[in-house]
């Protein structure tokens, strides 16, 4: 028969041993967990706490960087605004200076002759010279435009001009300045030469023909037409600018002839012009009657063909 006390003593060591084994197992497991944790940290490269600290530091650094960027952006905006304002002010000052300089400096004078040359170069058509009866120049010029329209050639006949010049006439002691035809008996016409336009010009009352070949006249050169129209262009430009007309040499004509006077013919077959019926100062001619074989015949003579009796 066994002793109960012995059984209890035997049981206690076994329970103690079991507890000890459990404790050792817990220690081993804890050690294993510690080893696993350390291995994980080693693999991560740094402890979790240090990583957390680094994350916080990086957050602070990012925040500081954002603040720096914002501050830099503000400074940049201020710099840009300042530079822009300075540039605008500088540009405005320069514009004002340029405007003032432009006001102070007079505009370069325009060469009226060169301007006329450029204008004539761009105009359509060419310039031709037509011959007219003496004293019919302005009448031919006035009639050409309506004739061109009525005969449907206004697209070919563009312009007619009678060049004028100033002369001084002295008659009976009186001196006066007048304008007269520079080319007595001639009219300048700008046109495209076609059979139709040629016919309209040639058959205008007062026209005797084209200068040059009757059916194929030659046009004036640019230099020739500029020379003829330059005086009027200069006067027109001077009036537009409010300036006096350019000074040029003016012809002086002394008219010693009067209507009704008797003169002697110094050139030609006529000895005496009985009576002057008309004086044409523009063409420097007179009309009168001469006796030929006992008959009075009307003639036209120039000033240099007669002298006062």
UniProtKB/Swiss-Prot annotation:
Residues 1-24, 58-91 are annotated as: Disordered. Pfam families: NusG. Coiled coil: none annotated. Residues 65-91 have a biased composition (Acidic residues). GO terms for cellular component: cytosol. Keywords: Transcription, Transcription antitermination, Transcription regulation, Transcription termination. It comes from the Bacteria. GO terms for biological process: DNA-templated transcription termination; regulation of DNA-templated transcription elongation; transcription antitermination; transcription elongation-coupled chromatin remodeling. Gene3D superfamilies: 2.30.30.30, NusG, N-terminal domain (3.30.70.940). CDD domains: KOW_NusG (cd06091), NGN_Bact_1 (cd09891). The keyword Transcription applies. The keyword Metal-binding does not apply. PROSITE patterns: NUSG (PS01014). NCBIfam families: nusG. Belongs to the NusG family. PANTHER family: RHO-INTERACTING TRANSCRIPTION TERMINATION FACTOR NUSG, TRANSCRIPTION TERMINATION_ANTITERMINATION PROTEIN NUSG. This is Transcription termination/antitermination protein NusG.
